[in-house]
């Protein structure tokens, strides 16, 4: 995404996949992420960061998300467990800036959750007891071995 071109539009929302962006497979550099943040700050825009599959990095250091770099709360972070646990685990999540929560609840509060409560409880326990992080670490080790 060329931010110079983005600045010439009336766009108020920018949807990005900074890790292995489809279809190019390119991961956004730190400077590109900073450009996105500058655009949001100067235009008053919102960034929706879709961070799916970022857990599959072969690097021993995780990539910084745009969400983690943006102190002014103009980034909505979304991700899913579909890629990291199983395709049948149709659970996604969104981290909203506090100022967006009320509007989200007002507009989306009437939608019913399609994820069974039991799956939500099992996933919560899997995360809370550290098994999810261990699972990701095993996958990353295997990916590094395959890359050699």
Predicted regions and their residues:
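Short, glycine/charged-enriched secondary-structure capping and boundary segments
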Residues: 28-31, 61-64, 91-93, 107
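Short, conserved catalytic or adaptor-binding loops enriched in Gly and charged residues
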Residues: 66-71
């Amino acid at each position: 995404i060329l931010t110079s071109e983005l600045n010439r539009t009336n766009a108020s929302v920018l949807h990005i996949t900074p890790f292995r962006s489809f279809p190019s497979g390119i991961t956004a550099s730190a400077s590109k992420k900073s450009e996105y943040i500058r655009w949001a700050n100067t235009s008053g825009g919102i960034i929706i960061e879709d961070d799916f599959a970022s857990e599959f990095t072969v690097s021993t250091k995780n990539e910084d998300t745009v969400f983690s770099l943006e102190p002014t709360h103009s980034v909505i972070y979304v991700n899913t467990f579909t890629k990291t646990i199983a395709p049948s685990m149709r659970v996604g999540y969104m981290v909203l800036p506090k100022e967006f929560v009320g509007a989200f609840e007002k507009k989306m509060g009437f939608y019913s959750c399609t994820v069974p409560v039991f799956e939500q409880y099992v996933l919560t326990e899997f995360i809370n007891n550290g098994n999810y992080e261990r699972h990701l670490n095993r996958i990353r080790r295997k990916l590094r071995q395959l890359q050699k």
